[in-house]
Swiss-Prot record:
Record keyword DNA-binding present: no
A Pfam family the protein falls into: CSN8_PSD8_EIF3K
Protein name: Eukaryotic translation initiation factor 3 subunit K
Primary location recorded for the protein, binned into one broad class: cytoplasm
Entry's Gene Ontology cellular component terms: eukaryotic 43S preinitiation complex; eukaryotic 48S preinitiation complex; eukaryotic translation initiation factor 3 complex
InterPro entries found in the cross-reference section: ARM-type_fold, CSN8_PSD8_EIF3K, eIF3k, PCI_dom, Transl_init_fac_sub12_N_euk, WH-like_DNA-bd_sf, WH_DNA-bd_sf
Subunit and interaction comment: Component of the eukaryotic translation initiation factor 3 (eIF-3) complex.
SUPFAM superfamilies in the record: ARM repeat (SSF48371), Winged helix' DNA-binding domain (SSF46785)
Keywords: Cytoplasm, Initiation factor, Protein biosynthesis
């Protein structure tokens, strides 16, 4: 049985107390939650439940919202791909932030980009990940200085994304071409070999990468049996011949 959705092993006691009581709806706790988001970014920890509680506070108190904190929450949610955390975060944002912008009319410097543009940029990355278009994910990430600004606060973002992509790949295949996996992980040479061998525990055999068998990538036949009683089948036949009222 998996851990509860609101569980976070690294959650501090004072955050747990806020989440367990009515103070989670108290605007005065906004600053505490914001500091906790920054702590997660720096320490490579993650607490979806607390982050969603902060976004809910922003919903009720939009004047307290901080753009940087919102984007940091979404970037942290990306590092948990393929979980639905990013979509949950989007659902708590104002609808106008999700409306497409006219790129010709909105082309500010990276540091001055509006929150709506930042949210849509991150959503584009999410869509690429969900579509398993990992090579385009990396090229898109490198295509705009705004992306560099958005992920700057999240320590180890690229490494975290490689781990998540590798985990997803291991659920689907047992062998993959080296060139393809290099594009998926955005790594080459010794860096690629170290990640594949030491981090993933996979084997490099020439131009192929071997992924160990696991419960997800093992090919197994499935037999499904359905027991239908004769009287149930008879009722279906009878209804087929009944005249409509």
């Amino acid at each position: 049985m998996g851990a509860p959705y609101d569980f976070a092993p690294e959650r501090p006691d004072h955050i747990q107390q806020i989440l367990d009581g009515l103070d989670r709806y108290n605007p005065e706790t906004t600053g505490v939650f914001q500091d906790y988001v920054m702590q997660q970014c720096e320490s490579q920890t993650y607490d979806c439940y607390a982050n969603l509680a902060l976004l809910k506070l922003y919903q009720f108190n939009p004047h307290l919202s901080r753009d940087e904190t919102v984007t940091n929450i979404l970037v942290k949610a990306l590092t948990m791909f393929p979980s639905p955390d990013f979509a949950l975060g989007l659902s708590l944002l104002p609808s106008h932030l999700l409306a497409p912008l006219n790129s010709s009319a909105h082309n500010p410097a990276a540091g001055d980009a509006p929150l709506s543009e930042a949210v849509q940029k991150l959503n584009e990355l999410r869509n690429l990940l969900e579509g398993a278009d990992y090579a385009t994910f990396w090229s898109t990430l490198d295509s705009d200085d705004l992306y560099a600004d958005l992920i700057a606060d999240v320590s180890g973002f690229e490494e975290l994304m490689r781990v998540r992509i590798a985990a997803t790949v291991s659920q689907a295949v047992r062998e993959v071409d080296r060139s393809i996996l290099e594009s998926w992980l955005n790594l080459e040479g010794s860096d690629f070999e170290h990640f594949v061998g030491s981090v993933c525990g996979w084997t490099i055999e020439g131009a192929k990468i071997k992924v160990p068998m696991n419960k997800d990538n093992e090919a197994k036949g499935t037999v499904v049996r359905e027991n239908v009683k004769f009287d149930q089948f008879a009722r279906v036949i009878k209804r087929a011949y009944e005249q409509p009222a």
